[in-house]
Curated annotation (Swiss-Prot):
It comes from Podospora anserina. This is Vegetative incompatibility protein HET-E-1. Keywords: GTP-binding, Nucleotide-binding, Repeat, WD repeat. GTP binds at G300, D301, P302, G303, K304, G305, K306, T307. InterPro entries: G-protein_beta_WD-40_rep, GPIID_WHD, HET, NACHT_NTPase, NPHP3-like_N, P-loop_NTPase, WD40/YVTN_repeat-like_dom_sf, WD40_repeat_CS. It holds the Pfam family WD40. Residues 294-629 form the NACHT domain. Disulfide bonds: none annotated.
Length: 1356
């Protein structure tokens, strides 16, 4: 930033560029521009021409006015920005709002407002001129009005006419800007629409500035692109705001501002007299005013008013001048949303970004890679810490106050949170912390490590607290008096009793006054009632529990208290009614239920129909963990009263009643979605919600079972036996439960729960139940992705594609869709593949497990790396930054980093938690084929196409060794277990062993007949396994260099090898689409894992529907029995992939089209080729016989259709007109027309006699499968059944989306559709490369080589 400086003599000169943090107090000028040639530029100042210009008059005014206000520095936009420097101009416009905001004063010089003129009555006429002045119509002056803390207005005569405060009503009337905005409320309090509307009556010289002048209002930074136009500039601004808002919405777990309002309302409002004492407290003032104390710990016993004290401090800090950032969070142990360190950090970041939106860049950086999932999973704390630390180091960060209430109620990861607080409180950033908690030694111990701290003990400020409590007592009595109609004498006695017994505890006063306000307490009994309340919070709890025990509903109240204390989150009244055995007259009457809960009012409170404890101390008291456990007998007695048979019995009740209510309530399609493909994003919760009573139970029932199993009780044993309650639930309601979990957006939690159940059973009883649980876990895991997206697919896709021997499939067979008559070739058992992870946009070239097996990294041809959670199968991170395909990935041994090697010749080191790139290692001269971490994680080895191996220091990124000696690309590298050696495999057919200290090659292992694609050390380092494109694996002795085993059996290149952890087995992966497991000692293959195969590119039915023909990448055509799914013929002869196959009408011949450019005619019985038709200039994508079998139509990548005479093999017609590859062709039943589908997204109808195109249908996607129906009125396609209208060619050419009927294939080939609606999701292994249909029969050919046949009995 560059300022102007006025010296004592009145001379004005520009300063040098001032860095952030070194800028002195300054004033700033706001004005309207005159003619460009009369405004003073930066160049004019430098050249000495400024004084001669008219615009200098404004600069002189600002200098003199600032001098009068005690400031010699000031800023004027015309001459403090070098507009000839585009970089400086960009930075200036993006910083303008901040410069106005940080100015000590803003002077608005209005050349069209005069204070010398008078109206007819002799009064000054400037008010009328002020309201009509040009300044209010300019775009850039909007931020100049709003941003500064002080804005003063001056007339043409340089006379002060008022400031923003004194003129606010007039300014509001002119501009329509709310008074709150003019008074300094955060702009984030106003909607995007409202802020945009403030520009309505304004204009700018350059049209793009209508958007650019709003950058500061929304605190966004975007590049300036003059020439793009106003609409494009506004579109970019809106897009940026939209993406930022989406990120902020995903970050938000709660809005602490709303929590503050809720807390204050629940406690009867914030009373200033109850907290104002702290403003004059020495410790608080030292923290607030000084620089040497950046952390203030406010500590005190329960009920001492810590939370309301912090609410008051927050309100006072909001009034700070200049305004800073204020972020706060209220922990609450009973609410799982806000009782953990992650939630605290999300809340603090949320408020910081809400107030200073430019800080969103620190969140967007990792968020743009990972999306919403960044805020989930085991690494979220690390990610949030990095974001938070980055925000605190932002050079544009204003003075920031961070406040956390009730650290003792942060029940998860408190030590991590305390470490973060102490660490950041010691930095030089402009931040200060206030935290509050009970007097817990472990909190004190960790906060003691902070070097710049202060402590404010409420017990040591007893006199101040007592005064504040007395004010609180008076406030409560003032509220009580009108309700109870007590006279002054009685009020005085109540006040005296409260004063003498409160013991400095706000909560004690609140609970007693609440009890006295009960309408059931008679006026004449009030003093007697008062006398029953003893001193001290725990004593009061004990007395109130005793009173509950004497009520008519004592047992019911105790049950409610027990359940409320045992559940894992606050529960709704509906959920409570399902977990506690209620009398009939209560369970069916919401008002009666609420009345019963209010009987527990000393302990519980109802907010928005959810039951909470009035205070954490109340819950602690009931659980026997009150503040003084050593001597507090009352708390232990309370525990024995509420949990007479132990808390495990309450866990049992919650578990059993959860199972019972789920069994009663859960049913298929509980939200009446009806459509099988109804997506979760479109679901709206019905009113009333049929899941209202079971929401808690669905998610937590297994947690309570686990509590029971881990206790000393033996009640759980029968639950885990065959034919018990759990067994019955799973065999009758399991699918309904999965559907409900999906609707509740809690399916991952459900999968983890069923895994816990499997673990519980695995250590106890064996039988049918454990088998069902294991199968259920596999079922849920396999189809998690689709059930999560479309809940009703639990009954369609999941049941249809589950193996035939799956117990869940057998048990729920009655739930299978009735509209599917038969389906062929579904596997009998769950295969070895437990998960398929989808998300990459291209081939996956490398995968690696983390050391703990909980994550997988994958590198892809799409230039990205993805991190996956292996338990749930969800992608947690997407790492972007490489400029080419990612050929290799590796986790560091500590699981915190990922290394990747790419086509772009670099290795990148990534933080696995945040997804940020921490190092880019450059130096290779070719593609990086392989990367590996050393066992200690301090080094990375890389192998490249440049024939070298490089060893890198992982911390500094420097190359410490370059190992040369291979004669071709280095395709694989591996460290030995001790890190002292590296093995490398190369395209020169050798393996080399290298000493990492000296960089010398100690062994060259020769014997392979092809490139060595993979090498691996055994765990003891004494052997190396190698895989080659000679189709073998070799085991080598590293000491002697001899080959001890050659493992043969693969039918293709061996591209990956690895030893088992015990060194006894070797696994190998090959491009023959198999994985083999070998005995490393004997060399025998013990297992072959199959599941991949060559892609099927085309399928066709025989006319009688009894056979199916398929064409494959392997160049063959296979004939299949459609009933049994067995292959009856293999036809070989094409020189490339077979893209299309078709039966002749009599079923005796098959036509096939290939990428070799030919069509072949085959005898279906003998398998011999009878004709080869040549003439296309590209791949033959589709073939079809005419109804009489005498002609064949073919469609090609050369964009033409050809008609062939099958007898002579001659081409009789070439049809041209498509703008893309012709993917499908079909004859009409009368043979007079041909339909063709193309990648240009059209279907054309051709007259076969003349060769002319008679109709063009714009269908919006590629029709890869076509056939006419028998009436000639419809065309059956992969996207559905399309009606052919009898209209002119011109009108049909304009048809953009014909109506599709019956069954088809979705545009993304992942859904089977019915009448254009998604009905059946296809799992990844069935993703379709070829499709054909005959009536209601559909055949799919998949990329994995599978053929699957569906017969649909009716429409959905």
């Amino acid at each position: 930033m560059r300022l102007l400086e006025r010296d004592d003599a009145g001379e004005i000169r520009p300063t040098k560029d001032l860095p952030s943090g070194k800028i002195p107090p300054y004033a700033i000028l706001s004005h309207t521009w005159g003619p460009d040639e009369e405004e003073v530029s930066y160049k004019d100042l430098k050249d000495g021409r400024a004084v001669s210009k008219l615009g200098y008059n404004k600069i002189r005014f600002c200098a003199d006015q600032a001098w009068r206000d005690g400031r010699k520095f000031f800023w004027v936009d015309t001459c403090c920005i070098d507009k000839s420097n585009s970089t400086e101009l960009q930075e200036a416009i993006n910083s303008m709002f901040r410069w106005y905001r940080d100015a000590a004063k803003c002077y608005v010089y209005l050349t069209d407002v005069s204070t010398d003129k008078r109206d007819a009555d002799g009064d000054p006429s400037w008010k009328w001129a002020f309201q009509k002045c040009k300044w209010f119509t300019r775009g850039w002056t909007l931020q100049e009005l709003i941003a500064p803390t002080s804005v003063e207005f001056f007339s043409r005569e340089k006379a002060r006419i008022g400031d923003r405060n004194s003129l606010e009503r007039m300014i509001h009337d002119v501009t329509g800007i709310p008074l709150e905005a003019l008074r300094g409320s955060p702009l984030s309090d106003f909607s995007v629409h409202d802020r945009m509307a403030w520009m309505k009556q304004r204009n700018t010289t350059r049209e793009e500035d209508m958007a650019y002048s709003l950058f500061g209002i929304f605190d966004v930074h975007l590049p300036l692109i003059y020439g793009e136009g106003k609409e494009k500039a506004l579109e970019r601004l809106r897009e940026k705001i939209g993406k930022d808002d989406g990120c902020l919405a995903d970050l938000r777990v709660t809005d602490p501002r709303h929590d503050k309002k809720r807390i204050e309302a629940a406690k009867g409002g914030l009373l200033k007299d109850s907290y104002c004492w702290v403003l004059s407290n020495v410790q608080f003032q030292q923290w607030h005013d000084g620089d040497d104390q950046r952390l203030l710990w406010i500590n005190g016993d329960p009920g001492k008013g810590k939370t309301m004290l912090l609410c008051g401090i927050i309100d006072e800090l909001k009034k700070s001048t200049p305004p800073g950032l204020l972020s706060f969070f209220f922990c609450q142990a009973t609410d799982s949303r806000i009782n953990n360190a992650t939630a605290v950090l999300r809340g603090l970041i949320y408020l910081l970004v809400s107030q200073q939106p430019a800080l969103i860049s620190h969140v967007r950086r990792p968020y743009d890679h990972a999306g919403k999932k960044m805020f989930e999973g085991p690494n979220v704390w690390i990610v949030l810490c990095e974001i938070f630390t980055s925000i605190l180091q932002d050079p544009g960060l204003r003075m920031t106050y961070l406040i956390i209430d009730a650290l003792d109620e942060c029940v998860t990861d408190l030590p991590q949170l305390l470490e973060l607080i102490t660490r950041t409180s010691c930095t030089s950033s402009p931040i200060k912390w206030i935290v509050s908690s009970r007097n817990w030694p472990d909190i004190e111990e960790q906060l003691e490590t902070a070097t710049q701290k202060a402590r404010l003990s409420l017990e040591l400020n007893a006199e101040s607290i007592s005064t504040a409590v007395n004010a609180f007592i008076q406030n409560r009595i003032d509220q009580l008096a009108p309700k109870t109609k007590h006279d002054a004498n009685m009020i005085g006695k109540i006040r005296d009793y409260l004063h003498s017994h409160a013991n400095g505890t706000f909560l004690w006063v609140a609970l007693v006054c609440q009890a006295l306000a009960d309408p059931k307490v008679k006026k004449r009994h009030i003093l007697a009632k008062l006398q029953t309340f003893p001193r001290g919070l725990d004593s009061l709890y004990a007395r109130m529990l005793e009173q509950i025990g004497h009520s008519e509903d004592a047992e019911l109240c105790k049950q409610i208290l027990a359940v409320a204390a045992a559940v894992r989150r606050p529960i709704s009244l509906d959920e409570l009614a399902s977990l506690v055995e209620m009398p009939d007259d209560v369970s069916d009457d919401p008002e009666s239920l609420e009345e019963i809960v209010k009987l527990c009012g000393s302990f519980l409170i109802i907010r928005e129909r959810t039951v909470y404890f009035v205070h954490q101390s109340a819950k602690d008291f009931l659980l026997g963990t009150a503040s003084d456990k050593a001597s507090n007998k009352a708390s232990q007695e309370a525990f024995e009263l509420v949990f007479p048979t132990g808390i495990e019995d309450v866990s049992y009740i919650i578990f059993w009643r959860s199972l019972n209510v789920m069994s009663q309530k859960l049913r298929r399609d509980i939200y009446c979605l009806n459509a099988p493909g109804f997506l979760i994003d479109n679901v709206r919760v019905p009113d009333p919600d049929p899941l209202a009573t079971v929401r808690y139970s669905c998610i937590y029932w297994i947690d309570h079972l686990r509590d029971l199993v881990s206790s000393t009780s033996s009640k759980w044993v029968h639950l885990l036996q065959d034919d018990g309650d759990i067994h019955r639930f799973l065999t009758t309601k399991y699918l309904y439960w999965l559907e409900a979990l999906s609707l509740l957006r809690a399916l991952p939690e459900g999968i983890n729960a069923i895994r816990q159940l499997e673990s519980l059973l695995g250590h106890t009883i064996r039988g049918r139940l454990i088998a069902i649980v294991r199968d259920g876990y596999r079922f849920a895991l396999s189809y998690r992705m689709i059930i999560e997206k479309a809940p009703l697919q639990a009954y369609t896709s999941a049941l249809v594609f589950a193996p035939t021997d799956s117990m869940i499939k057998k048990i729920f067979k009655k739930e299978e869709p009735g509209w599917i008559s038969t389906i062929s070739v579904v596997e009998a058992e769950w295969n070895a593949c437990t998960q398929t992870l989808e998300g990459h946009g291209s081939s996956v070239l490398s995968v690696a497990f983390s050391a703990d097996g909980q994550r997988v990294a994958s590198g892809s041809d799409d230039k990205t790396i993805k991190i996956w959670d292996t338990a749930s199968g969800t992608g947690t991170q997407t790492l972007e930054g490489h400029g080419g395909s990612v050929w290799s990935v590796a986790f560091s041994p500590d699981r915190e980093r990922v290394a990747s090697g790419s086509d772009d010749k670099t290795i990148k080191i990534w933080d696995a938690a945040s997804g940020t790139c921490t190092q880019t290692l450059e130096g290779h001269g070719g593609r990086v084929q392989s990367v590996a971490f050393s066992p200690d994680g301090q080094r990375v080895a890389s192998g490249s196409d440049d024939h070298t191996i490089k060893i890198w220091d992982a911390a500094s990124g420097t190359c410490t060794q370059t190992l040369e000696g291979h004669g071709s690309s280095v395709l694989s590298v591996a460290f030995s277990p001790d890190g002292q050696r590296v093995a490398s495999g190369s395209g020169d057919k050798t393996i080399k062993i290298w000493d990492t200290a000296s960089g010398t090659c100690t062994q060259t292992l020769e014997g392979h007949g092809g490139s060595v694609w993979s090498v691996a050390f055994s765990p003891d380092g004494q052997r190396v396994a190698s895989g080659s494109d000679d189709k073998t694996i070799k085991i080598w002795d590293t000491a002697s260099g001899t080959c001890t085993q050659t493992l043969e059996g693969h039918g293709g290149w061996v591209q990956s090898v690895v030893f088992s952890p015990d060194g006894q087995r070797v696994a190998s992966g090959s491009d023959d689409h198999t994985i083999k497991i070998w005995d490393a000692v004997s060399g025998t293959c013990t297992q072959t894992l199959e599941g991949h195969g060559d892609s099927v590119w085309s399928v066709a039915f025989s006319p009688d529907g009894q056979r199916v023909a398929s064409g494959s990448i392997d160049g063959t055509i296979k004939i299949w029995d459609a009933a049994s799914g067995t292959c009856t013929q293999t036809l070989e002869g094409h020189g490339g992939w077979v893209h299309s196959v078709a039966f002749s009408p009599d079923g005796q011949r098959v036509a096939s089209g290939s990428i070799d450019g030919t069509i072949k005619i085959w005898d279906a019985a003998s398998g011999t080729c009878t004709q080869t038709l040549e003439g296309h200039g590209g791949w033959v994508q589709s073939v079809a016989f005419s109804p009489d079998g005498q002609r064949v139509a073919s469609g090609s990548s050369d964009k033409t259709i050809k008609i062939w005479d099958t007898a002579s093999g001659t081409c009789t017609q070439t049809l041209e007109g498509h703008g893309g590859w012709v993917q499908s062709v079909a004859f009409s039943p009368d043979g007079q027309r041909v339909a063709s589908g193309s990648s240009d997204n059209t279907i054309k109808i051709w007259d076969t006699a003349s060769g002319t195109c008679t109709q063009t249908l714009n269908v919006g996607s590629t029709a890869t499968c076509l056939s006419f129906d028998y009436t000639n009125a419809y065309i059956n396609t992969n996207i559905g059944r399309i009606q052919i209208a009898t209209a002119t060619m011109e009108s049909l050419n304009q048809l953009s989306s014909p109506v599709c009927y019956s069954y088809g294939l979705g545009q993304d080939h992942r859904w089977i559709t019915c009448n254009n609606q998604n009905v059946l999701w296809l799992p990844p292994e069935y993703h379709t490369s070829a499709f054909t249909m005959q009536g209601r029969k559909i055949v799919l050919g998949s990329y994995s080589g599978r053929i699957i046949i569906f017969l649909f009995s009716r429409d959905v």
